[in-house]
Curated annotation (Swiss-Prot):
Family of the protein in this entry: Belongs to the PAL/histidase family.
Protein's name according to its UniProt entry: Phenylalanine ammonia-lyase
Entry keyword annotation includes Plastid: no
Lineage, broadest ranks: Eukaryota, Viridiplantae, Streptophyta, Embryophyta, Tracheophyta
Pathway: Phenylpropanoid metabolism; trans-cinnamate biosynthesis; trans-cinnamate from L-phenylalanine: step 1/1
Organism superkingdom: Eukaryota
């Protein structure tokens, strides 16, 4: 019987052997200090989320993606998927030997009579069957997996988007380059050529459960490579190509491939379609997360919010890094903002004009967004690990001369990450809708007109009322999409695939969520720009009203009928306080109307002064009551003309007071929307609808044009909150 000490010695020896073996295997990297990869995962999360997004954007714009199997990023996948700036794919020559070795091992193993899954056996629940016709087996694999429906001749489109297909091709190449899959390097080169020539195989939209990988859609890439008659592709201009035409256009100077043992399985048994689409989704999700932080800050500006909600101590005491960063980003935008300075003065004039604290959609936006940023960031890292993983079965370990039968094809990281991301997107959308609802509601928006209407006649301008209804629709659909996909697993393939990830389905639903959040973001930003312009108009109109009231007060209240100084001259200061405190859009359509608050409160000032005028009121020459009618008549004569003059000057681009936004850190986004996209102030007098303007921004957002102005808003941020003073 073996002694305990002997057993320990033996185990230590075996452990040392395994580590030495791993170090000597060129295809494997073992970190003795971090054998479970938790350290690597934690290291990847260092630094700010914004810096990571900036790196993503920079990487997205590089002209070449060099594949080696282990360094692919989601931004590179997104770049190849979009192919909007001609980015090309290069394969690392250093990977050729490893790929070749695993391919040769499969052939040698079969020639020796070794029994290997998918090489000499059937597939899945029927793997008990055996054959020596390895090539024919691969051919049959592709045939029976071509089970997708495209809906040709119907109105429905059941073809996977080209972007997702291109992403899948790139990810599958990257996986196979690691040399554990038993496939010829020439096949990987052949998949690369259509990517570089924008020739895209047609894959079915549905039909995969992403375990055992994305079998059905990936089989159509294999079908094109093998020249199956049902294979189709799209050319650069969208033209439909058969397999031969696709080969010619892609520059594949070879006949269709006759797949060797294991090669068909290597092509189809992976998670590339789900993880490819997930990469595209997460690139956009990271941009939208930063955008939501900046839009929350702009919302605070136009709502005359109190900036203390971003104070670093508050968020430091909560400890969550996403929250701390979200608050710091908002703090940076608001620091030095002209809107914040003006709001501070306003709050000092009348502390009771608005609640002591802003509502939750403004005040708790960092606490709301922070965890969502963390979820999106963690999901990004999870998918980045997945697209650099070897995820087929069996795996060929040439160094140990064996095929490993496992389950890396299980795409659970995709399904879970996409479900979590979709939930985060829905929560961002909910915050955005709450902010939008406050912005258009004159009970909550601190003086902006109802529905953000900008016309002279508000009874014929309902502004963003339709947009608010649309936002409710978007938000409802987005929240419905937040329901998890991964809880709907069905047992498949004769109960062999009895648990499966549904990774691609979840990625597809998250892609839908991205689109809806982009609709919401574009609508919200157009509304914020409207609010910015209304604040500018408000300031100019108030200035005109204030000057006119001052002018009329001096003219009518300073002197008595006999040329003596009149007691009513002391009313001017209080009259101007009324103008300062009263919301312009509450009266500006008819500024002298006796039913509107301005006229009522101006009169009240004169009445109050008259009541304390004492005995002087009994004298006609010194009576303030006697001046009220004169003051009001003069104001009615002058004020409407001056208000119209101020509005006309504003509309012609020559306002007396410049727009505060010009000196704010949020200006690049405003400038992009107004100048680059050519949008303007929406009014009922104008034929342009809100949807037309939102459409311009949505299209630009889908093309990535919002990224530069967004990052420009944060260009001066040093990655840290302001010091606690």
């Amino acid at each position: 019987m073996e002694t305990i000490s002997a057993a320990i010695t033996k185990n230590n020896a075996n452990e040392s052997f395994c580590l030495i073996h791993a170090k000597n295997n060129n295809n494997m990297k073992v970190n003795e200090a971090d054998p479970l990869n938790w350290g690597v995962a934690a290291e990847a999360m260092k630094g700010s989320h914004l810096d990571e997004v900036k790196r993503m954007v920079a990487e997205y714009r590089k002209p070449v993606v060099r594949l080696g199997g282990e360094t692919l990023t989601i931004s590179q996948v997104a770049a190849i998927a979009a192919h909007d700036h001609g980015v090309q794919v290069d394969l690392s020559e250093s990977a050729r030997d490893g790929v070749k070795a695993s391919s040769e091992w499969v052939m040698e193993s079969m020639n020796k009579g070794t029994d290997s899954y998918g090489v000499t056996t059937g597939f899945g629940a029927t793997s008990h069957s055996r054959t020596k016709q390895g090539g024919a087996l691969q051919k049959e694999l592709i045939r029976f997996l071509n089970a997708g429906i495209f809906g040709n001749g119907t109105e429905s489109n059941h073809t996977l988007p080209k972007t997702a297909t291109r992403a899948a091709m790139l990810v599958r190449i990257n996986t196979l380059l690691q040399g554990y899959s038993g496939i010829d390097f020439e096949i990987l080169e052949a998949i690369t050529k259509p990517l570089n020539k924008t020739v895209t195989p047609c894959l079915p939209l549905r039909g995969t459960i992403t375990a055992s990988g994305d079998l059905v859609p990936l089989s159509y890439i294999a079908g094109l490579l093998t020249g199956r008659p049902n294979s189709k592709a799209h050319g650069p201009s969208g033209e439909v190509l058969n397999a031969k035409e696709a080969f010619n256009l892609a520059g594949i100077n070879a006949e269709f491939f006759e797949l060797q043992p294991k090669e068909g399985l290597a092509l189809v048994n992976g998670t590339a379609v789900g993880s490819g689409l997930a990469s595209i989704v997460l690139f956009e999700a990271n941009i939208l997360a930063v955008l939501s932080e900046v839009l929350s800050a702009i919302f605070a500006e136009v709502m005359q919010g109190k900036p203390e909600f971003t104070d670093h101590l508050t968020h430091k005491l909560k400890h969550h890094p996403g929250q701390i960063e979200a608050a710091a980003i908002m703090e940076h935008i608001l620091d030095g903002s002209s809107y914040v300075k003006a709001a501070k003065k306003l709050h000092e004039i009348d502390p009771l004009q608005k609640p002591k604290q802003d509502r939750y959609a403004l005040r708790t936006s960092p606490q709301w967004l922070g965890p969502l940023v963390e979820v999106i960031r963690f999901s990004t890292k999870s998918i980045e690990r997945e697209i650099n993983s070897v995820n087929d079965n069996p795996l060929i370990d040439v160094s140990r001369n064996k095929a490993l039968h496992g389950g890396n094809f299980q795409g659970t990281p995709i399904g879970v990450s996409m479900d979590n991301t979709r939930l985060a997107l829905a929560s961002i959308g909910k915050l955005m809708f709450a902010q939008f609802s406050e912005l258009v509601n004159d009970f909550y928006n601190n003086g902006l007109p109802s529905n953000l209407s900008a016309s002279r006649n508000p009874s014929l301008d309902y502004g963003f009322k339709g947009a608010e209804i649309a936002m409710a629709s978007y938000c409802s659909e987005l929240q419905y999409l937040a329901n998890p996909v991964t809880t709907h697993v069905q047992s498949a393939e004769q109960h062999n695939q009895d648990v499966n990830s549904l990774g691609l389905i979840s990625a597809r639903k998250t892609n839908e969520a991205i689109e809806i959040l982009q609709l919401m973001s574009s609508t919200f930003l157009i509304a914020l720009c409207q609010a910015i312009d209304l604040r500018h108009l408000e300031e100019n109109l108030k200035n005109s009203v204030k000057n006119t009231v001052s002018q009329v007060a001096k003219k009518t209240l300073t002197m008595g009928v006999n040329g003596e100084l009149h007691p009513s001259r002391f009313c001017e200061k209080d009259l101007l306080k009324v103008v300062d405190r009263e919301h312009v859009f509450a009266y500006i359509d008819d500024p002298c109307s006796a039913t509107y608050p301005l006229s009522q409160k101006l009169r009240q000032v004169l009445v109050d002064h008259a009541l304390v005028n004492g005995e002087s009121e009994k004298n006609f020459n010194t009576s303030i009551f006697q001046k009220i009618a004169t003051f009001e008549e003069e104001l009615k004569t002058l004020l409407p003309k001056e208000v119209e003059s101020a509005r006309t000057a504003y509309e012609s681009g020559n306002p007396t007071i410049p727009n505060k936004i010009n000196g704010c850190r949020s200006y690049p986004l405003y400038k992009f929307v107004r100048e680059e996209l050519g949008t303007g102030l929406l009014t009922g007098e104008n034929v342009i609808s809100p949807g037309e303007e939102c459409d311009k921004l949505f299209s630009a957002m889908c093309q990535g044009k919002i990224i530069d102005p967004l990052l420009e808003c944060l260009g001066e941020w040093n990655g840290a909150p302001l010091p606690i003073c």
